[in-house]
């Protein structure tokens, strides 16, 4: 099983689905890892009746997070067209780090 699947949307935005993790508790665990390991300057999330939407901002780079995706799993979302190649690489590395840590802490 892949740790995550990456999808390019019609306008070039990237959606990264975290394989095997869904719902609120997994989302909270993911955000705890983001705060502890990535150490963003700012992060947060809000809960409504449909999903949890969140974000983190590090080095001036915004990455959005969600518990809602095509498969109702955890996801990351970012727009590489508005970023340098170096910033895109940072995001890819952050996602890889968070997802590996999530699998280590909550194996499935």
Residues of each region from the PLM?
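Generic recognition of long tandem-repeat/solenoid scaffolds
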Residues: 12-21, 54-57, 76-78
